[in-house]
């Protein structure tokens, strides 16, 4: 049969690239589960009353090449001015060896959060290095493995200060008036829901204020002034006030550590260490505190522990602080950090080492000194005598200066009264400084760089003597070895080889949606048109970004059934928080601010109650029935009991149990009947897109995990993106921004993230995914995700019972395998199965969530039938091994499961196990072997002997 030209053009080619099973494989699986077609299977599983009659109109699919060309044309509308705006964002030089071998490498960016440490030792080591950088530069005892951004870290510092404060009756938080405005914005938003009063004043006036539990200072103020706060901090400490200091990571290379000055908490952005500005993100924040406060710290902490053989190994420490365990009592709701960006920053420090970092910092400072000297020589005045990289220059003809800057494609900071701000960075050259002289002084300034350099080299007083660092930094061998590109390349590869990512095997984590992150989707994030824009540049320079964001928002509106989308939240947890704030402010606008009860099903993810608590709500748990569904009788009773105090319900759909609940619309109706709003958690949108939608179901607001459903990679634990979709009545209450108000910013509400559009530079990934898939591809992706999950469930249910099913015994896009009966019968646990899967070359499914003693499997649509069968065969082989234990062939205390995973060194050691080496490391069906580098970790040892910095030099000998 002759094909048409349209068929030969094959605009939907990417759909077949993204979806793992081909048509023949899909039919085989449909036959196996007893369904005639994808539509028939969907019709059986999804409740009829929520099925869309027509798919969302997001356009036809495009090929990878057509989509890239289209997005390139949009990106070209961005204007790449040289930005000296500062305010916590600077241009960088990302070393090409890190760009190519990490940022562009799926071995790094497709990995998951290192909850399974045995398959995560590489990125755990890189994160431990990040913590060591933080400890050395801040002078404190404990560091986290990153937070979402500097402003969020400030809000977390405030919350932590209250937790650890001995002044229990104090309720005021003092913020120095020269912190970055976006930091103050986010702090104020968080303080409102916690009921704190924020005082903003000159730092030296802090002692004039009473009932203050915590203080936020900025070591290098937003307009550039270096502050010596030693005496002030000492006085504050004598009054038992918790002191937090925001610091510049590059300035800390030269400046004294705030911890040495007495600070309790130090934080800042690590963006300057090699991470492009990207119109606001993603960037990792660093966060450090005194040892006595370690159990009150937010975020993940990497600790040094031991494995079963006594070898040094790394793991995430003190996980009992986290939201998935502590729920509303957690230190923070954050479950995504910025691992990929933290690792870029850590490897930037490894590559440059202390000598290289000092050279960079000194060069930036020298050029700033030269610029200052020239301006002073010509009669201009500087607001501050002490500075690192930022000058606040008083100008008589500010409009003229800004006009000349614009003509030279230069951005200066323009929001300072009668002055401009100029922040230099590692990309600044002597030619740039000469251009700045011309902008500020005119072309005939007559200044010479070399002459000025001689003057300032011998007489620089711009950093106070007391503020110069007098201790060594980064003395650990890891920062003093890998400085040639060859060594660095091999070090990074050695780390990558320790980890298991999607480039090696399926990662069947339930509730995580570890789908393909296609190369074509990733390419645009490193385009300079997207990577180099400052988030506070004039709007007319970011027209490409605005077009791309507006188009993506429009698509998401259509896919979710909502009326508006806000892109600011830079993680799913932030999206939850922002959505709940919108509900809170909506109620307040109706004089119903007393509505503060949030209903949450017992099956919910721990982030839900943690977010509700952060939003100032009381959590009331709604029971689930024996089938895992929301108990409608209990829901009605709890809603009626809450009455006029009911704020909302947080519900996940399909449920966290992996089932399309038949009564979801009734749930929405009950909550609306009592004046509440419905927050539908978007974590499981991968089973909704094109089939149903939150808005159609009846919800009022949802966050969308773009790092799940819409293909932003997990990055080993971040970045994420959590934009929120809202119905029209909530649109006026989504986050705004104090610095940037442009079209696309829907409101004047407070911010939840530092940048107006959150992690804007990764939004092209989701844009590309939707553009290449089109409406038909997106629906098919959801359908195949459902098919793959049901295929696994049907083939494994005899060996491992599926805990919850919906109509006709079907599941949604994931299934829960119940290990409890086997554990009771044989003593083999879900943990043993998870670790044994490593020997078979797989990352484990989600363990003990949402039900203890289970494994939750989510295959996604991207995995082929071949890979699904490989996983199924591994699980069936493991079941046969369990039967061997049950039959007494292998003792419970010594068998391949309890000893898993097995490592290479065991093969050449004395072997005393009742099973062979071959059974241990090459079990049935394993051909392409993944080798873990450590055995099972000792979690108890790690938490009892908390050690969160680089291991001693002796470990390298």
Curated annotation (Swiss-Prot):
- Protein name in the entry: Glycine dehydrogenase (decarboxylating)
- Pfam family example for this protein? GcvP2_C
Give the Gene Ontology MF terms in alphabetical order: glycine binding; glycine dehydrogenase (decarboxylating) activity; pyridoxal phosphate binding
NCBIfam families, alphabetized = gcvP, PRK04366.1
- Gene3D superfamilies xrefs: Aspartate Aminotransferase, domain 1, Type I PLP-dependent aspartate aminotransferase-like (Major domain)
- What does the record give as the function of this protein? The glycine cleavage system catalyzes the degradation of glycine. The P protein binds the alpha-amino group of glycine through its pyridoxal phosphate cofactor; CO(2) is released and the remaining methylamine moiety is then transferred to the lipoamide cofactor of the H protein.
- One CC-aspect GO term: glycine cleavage complex
Catalytic activity field = N(6)-[(R)-lipoyl]-L-lysyl-[glycine-cleavage complex H protein] + glycine + H(+) = N(6)-[(R)-S(8)-aminomethyldihydrolipoyl]-L-lysyl-[glycine-cleavage complex H protein] + CO2
Q: Which family does it belong to?
A: Belongs to the GcvP family.
Q: What is its EC number?
A: 1.4.4.2
Q: Which cofactor does it need?
A: pyridoxal 5'-phosphate
**What is the originating organism of this protein?**
Escherichia coli O6:K15:H31 (strain 536 / UPEC)
* Protein keywords: Oxidoreductase, Pyridoxal phosphate
């Amino acid at each position: 049969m002759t094909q048409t030209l349209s068929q030969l053009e094959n605009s939907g080619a990417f759909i077949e690239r993204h979806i793992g099973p081909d048509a023949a494989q899909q039919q085989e699986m449909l036959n196996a589960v007893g369904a005639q077609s994808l539509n028939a299977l969907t019709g059986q599983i999804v409740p009829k009353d929520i099925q869309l009659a027509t798919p969302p109109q997001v356009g036809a699919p495009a090929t990878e090449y057509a989509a890239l060309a289209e997005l390139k044309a949009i990106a070209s509308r961005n204007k790449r001015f040289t930005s000296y705006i500062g305010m916590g964002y600077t241009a960088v030089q990302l070393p090409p060896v890190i760009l190519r071998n990490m940022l562009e490498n799926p071995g790094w960016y497709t990995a998951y959060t290192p909850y399974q440490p045995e398959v995560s030792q590489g990125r755990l080591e890189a994160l431990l290095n990040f913590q060591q950088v933080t400890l050395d530069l801040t002078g404190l005892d404990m560091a986290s493995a990153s937070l979402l951004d500097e402003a969020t870290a400030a809000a977390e510092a405030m919350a932590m200060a209250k937790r650890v404060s001995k002044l229990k009756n104090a309720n005021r938080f003092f913020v120095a008036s020269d912190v970055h405005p976006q930091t103050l914005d986010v702090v104020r938003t968080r303080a409102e829901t916690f009921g704190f009063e924020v005082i903003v004043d000159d730092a030296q006036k802090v002692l004039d204020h009473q009932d203050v539990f915590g203080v936020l200072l900025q070591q290098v103020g937003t307009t550039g002034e270096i502050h010596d706060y030693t005496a002030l901090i000492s006085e504050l400490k004598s009054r038992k006030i918790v002191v937090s200091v925001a610091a510049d990571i590059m300035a800390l290379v030269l400046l004294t550590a705030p911890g040495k000055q007495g600070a309790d908490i130090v934080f800042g952005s690590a963006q300057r260490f090699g991470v492009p500005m990207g119109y606001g993100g993603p960037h990792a924040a660093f966060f450090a505190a005194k040892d006595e406060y370690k159990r009150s710290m937010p975020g993940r902490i990497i600790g040094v522990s031991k494995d079963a053989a006594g070898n040094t190994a790394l793991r995430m420490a003190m996980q009992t602080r986290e939201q998935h365990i502590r729920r509303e009592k957690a230190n923070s709701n954050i479950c995504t950090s910025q691992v990929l960006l933290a690792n870029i920053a850590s490897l930037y420090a490894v590559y440059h080492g202390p000598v290289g970092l000092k050279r960079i910092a000194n060069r930036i400072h020298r050029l700033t000194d030269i610029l200052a000297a020239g301006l002073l020589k010509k009669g201009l005045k500087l607001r501050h005598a002490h500075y690192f990289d930022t000058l606040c220059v008083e100008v008589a003809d500010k409009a003229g200066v800004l006009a000349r800057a614009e003509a030279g494609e230069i951005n200066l900071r323009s929001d300072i009264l009668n002055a401009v701000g100029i922040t230099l960075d590692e990309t600044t050259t002597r030619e740039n400084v000469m251009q700045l002289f011309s902008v500020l002084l005119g072309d005939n300034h007559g200044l010479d760089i070399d002459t000025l350099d001689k003057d300032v080299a011998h007489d620089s007083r711009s950093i106070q003597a007391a503020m110069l660092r007098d201790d060594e930094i980064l003395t650990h061998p890891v920062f003093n070895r890998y400085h040639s590109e060859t060594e660095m390349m091999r070090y990074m590869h050695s780390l990558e080889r320790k980890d298991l990512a999607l480039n090696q095997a399926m990662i069947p984590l339930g509730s995580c949606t570890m789908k393909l992150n296609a190369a074509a989707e990733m390419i645009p994030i490193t385009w300079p048109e997207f990577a180099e824009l400052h988030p506070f540049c004039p709007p007319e320079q970011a027209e490409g970004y605005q077009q791309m964001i507006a188009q993506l928002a429009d698509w998401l509106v259509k896919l979710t059934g909502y009326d508006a989308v806000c892109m600011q939240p830079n993680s799913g947890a932030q999206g939850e928080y922002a959505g709940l704030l919108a509900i809170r402010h909506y109620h307040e606008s109706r004089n119903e601010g007393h509505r503060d009860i949030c209903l949450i099903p017992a099956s919910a993810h721990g982030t839900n109650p943690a977010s509700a608590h952060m939003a100032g709500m009381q959590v009331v748990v709604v029971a689930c029935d024996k089938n895992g569904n929301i108990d409608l009788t209990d829901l009605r009773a709890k809603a009626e009991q809450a009455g006029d105090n009911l704020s909302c319900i947080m519900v996940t759909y399909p449920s966290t149990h992996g089932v399309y609940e038949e009564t979801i619309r009734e749930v929405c109706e009950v909550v609306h009947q009592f004046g509440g709003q419905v927050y539908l958690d978007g974590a499981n949108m991968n089973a909704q897109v094109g089939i149903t939608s939150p808005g159609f179901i009846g919800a009022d607001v949802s966050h969308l995990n773009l790092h799940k459903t819409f293909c932003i990679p997990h990055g080993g634990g971040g970045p994420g993106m959590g934009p929120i979709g809202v119905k029209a009545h909530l649109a006026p209450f989504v986050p705004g921004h104090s610095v940037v108000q442009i079209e696309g910013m829907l409101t004047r509400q407070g911010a939840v993230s530092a940048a107006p559009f959150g992690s804007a530079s990764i939004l092209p990934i989701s844009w590309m995914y939707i553009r290449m898939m089109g409406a038909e591809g997106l629906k098919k992706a959801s359908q195949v995700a459902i098919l793959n999950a049901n295929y696994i469930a049907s083939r494994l249910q005899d060996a491992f019972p599926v805990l919850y099913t919906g109509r006709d015994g079907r599941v949604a896009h994931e299934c829960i395998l119940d290990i409890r009966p086997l554990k009771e019968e044989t003593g083999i646990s879900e943990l043993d199965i998870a670790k044994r899967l490593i020997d078979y070359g797989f990352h484990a499914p989600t363990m003990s969530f949402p039900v203890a003693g289970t494994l939750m499997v989510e295959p996604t649509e991207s995995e082929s039938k071949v890979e699904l069968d490989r996983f199924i065969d591994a699980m069936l082989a493991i079941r046969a091994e369990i039967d061997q234990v049950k039959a007494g062939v292998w003792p419970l205390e010594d068998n391949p499961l309890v000893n898993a995973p097995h490592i290479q060194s065991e093969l050449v050691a004395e072997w005393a196990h009742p099973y062979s080496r071959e059974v241990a490391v090459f079990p049935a069906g394993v051909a392409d072997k993944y080798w873990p580098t450590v055995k099972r970790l000792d979690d108890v040892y790690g938490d009892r002997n908390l050690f969160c910095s680089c291991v001693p030099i002796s470990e390298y000998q």
